[in-house]
Amino acid sequence: MSDATTDLGAQWREEWAGAQKIKGPSMKNSSVFYRNIEEELDMSRKSGLCFPIHLPSHVSDFSTCDVLGMGHTGALREEFLKELDANPGFYMGAGGSRLLDGTTEYQDSFEKELAKLMGVESALVVHSGYTANQAIFSTVPRSGDVLVYDELMHATALSGMKISLALDQRPFRHNDVEHFIEVMEAVKESTPLVKAGKRCVIVGVESYYSMDGDICPLRELIEAAKEIFPHGNAQFIVDEAHSFGVCGPEGTGFVREQGLNDEVAITMATFTKALSGAGGE
């Protein structure tokens, strides 16, 4: 191990140790507002869970989401500047929300091109994958619908589910097709409106599960859902955050790679990972 790497490790340990110092008792003469904040942070410090922010360094980063390295090559920057020069009327700011005057001609054109690339009816770009997942799972399932989801769905999806009108929410064991079938059969028997095809079962899964490194058995899940709910009211939402840009025709993701794009109602993808950009759709 090089001296530089050793020194960097020692520096990180020193920064971490410094961040664990208890501050609440020294705040007795401060405003209760700031004292309460420090006392709350002290709970994390006592457990060694207060982590300082590190600047990028020369060490190898095995946790990066820049999986294709495009953010580090300089090629993306060059293409961005070329695109900027080719569109002198490009408006740099938002100027307002999308519902007011925040939608530009360039953005509208981009979303149409993206929809064409993905072979879907329409695409909507928001500022992050977190926002995209939260928006989808909080607004698409309606009252009386049932949410069935893989137990390892990302926290962003779970955040949206918490404020969804679909109050009946049931997880199934991770990538377990047999347990998925059990859950879906239970939904069918306990929810007459869903059984009759008058309400929907919204199934949430990820294509690639980044924390576990495995792949969703999407085809098997879809086939099972169609058999259990022949009215076509079992619909899938697939989080493609870690597959968009790395598989499928022209990098369009796992769903299209499997030829299942006509079987999936909504796919969510991010530009922050393989594409080294920002935003989610």
Regions inferred by a protein language model and the residue ranges of each:
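Conserved Walker B
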Residues: 97, 152, 208, 240-242
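Conserved PLP-anchoring active-site segment centered on the Schiff-base-forming lysine
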Residues: 136-155, 177, 181
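Conserved N-terminal alpha-helix of the aminotransferase class I/II PLP-enzyme fold
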Residues: 78-128
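Active-site phosphate-binding strand-loop segment of PLP-dependent enzymes
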Residues: 170, 174-237
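Active-site PLP attachment segment
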Residues: 256-281
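Substrate-binding/gating loop at the entrance of the active-site cleft, primarily
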Residues: 128, 148-165
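N-terminal "arm"/small-domain region of PLP-dependent enzymes with the aminotransferase-like
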Residues: 3-92
